[in-house]
Amino acid sequence: AFLTAVVLFCVTAASIHFFAGSRIEANNREFGTWINSKKDHSYNAVAANLHDDTYLMMGSSEFQHGNNTPYHPTAIFNQANMDVMCIGAAGNQCLPHAIAMGALAPDLKSKKVVLLVSPTWFAKGGIGKSEFSARFSESMYAAMLKNDSLSDDLKQKLIDRTTKLLEVSPLMKANVDRATKVLTGDNLNNGQTQKTSLEDKVNYYIHSWIAQEKERIGVGMMWKLSGHKNNRTYEPQNAKEPDWDALKIQADKEFEKECTNEFYMKDELFKIKYKKVLKERKDSETKRSFEESPEYDDLKLFLDICKDQGIEAKLILLPINGYWY
């Protein structure tokens, strides 16, 4: 029975390996605008698909909404033949992106990144521990620690913030603590000597290999199941500037007839979700403030990493509807 189980496991593993493919390089511009959390969590998958003309774009839930419209970033940049690597989903805020930036900076040949900043990130508590653990990538974290050009001071800030937020996820925190110990030795951890045992090193490298293999297979399977394919080589296209004025006029015209209520929400959503709670929700957010938040420090950390790594960063503050947002 044991031998049969081993044989079945080997056959299954080999089949998955064959289907997923042996390489992560897609050589396909659509890989960057493919919105998928497994891709976002895999340092190797993202780094392998950063080309000379790739711009990095980081954000959150806006990547998951409106992707069937011509106004979604993926649609706009694909049409303009621009190679953009999008990273982000609901729950992403400045800190996960700061870790990813620290990891990917040496691979980002264009040295350009755009961060889509959502005002709602700057709530009093900043990013929640559960949200952070859900968006945390062990492989991005490890690659950040391996980035020899990133200053020890910035690494230490990322380590401290990560360790605190992962308190709700003991297993993930244990993996992070082990990675930090093995990959930094005595250099960090606020000057405290860390004795890295042979057992720690063996456990880390075994766990790291298994995790990377799972990432590679997971990304490869999802990429192919979504109908995409790998190309033999990457061929840069002649990128062009999107016609922003025309897109704005088109969007205003299209949504004007869909947002006729007093708050300029989409009528369908307003009728289903908000109209019935207007009275009880009135003035409920008047005392809410975004003036103080640890998110500002996380944003500064992101920008400090960009400066340290010679990355040109552009921040886009997402527009919000002041009547109700």
Question: For the regions a protein language model found, what residue spans apply to each?
Answer:
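Short loop/turn segments at strand-loop or loop-helix junctions that form parts
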Residues: 59-60, 115-120, 274-277, 316-321
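Membrane/wall-proximal cationic-aromatic binding patches
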Residues: 23-82, 99-101
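Secreted/periplasmic serine-hydrolase-like ester/acetyl group-modifying domain
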Residues: 143-297
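Extended hydrophobic/aromatic segments used for targeting, binding, or gating
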Residues: 76, 284, 291-325
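Hydrophobic membrane-insertion alpha-helices, especially the h-region
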Residues: 1-18
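Loop/turn elements at helix/coil->beta-strand transitions in domains of secreted/extracellular proteins
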Residues: 52-54, 82, 109-112, 308-314
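Membrane-embedded segments
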Residues: 63-157
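Acidic/glycine-enriched edge-of-secondary-structure segments
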Residues: 23-33, 80-92, 279-290
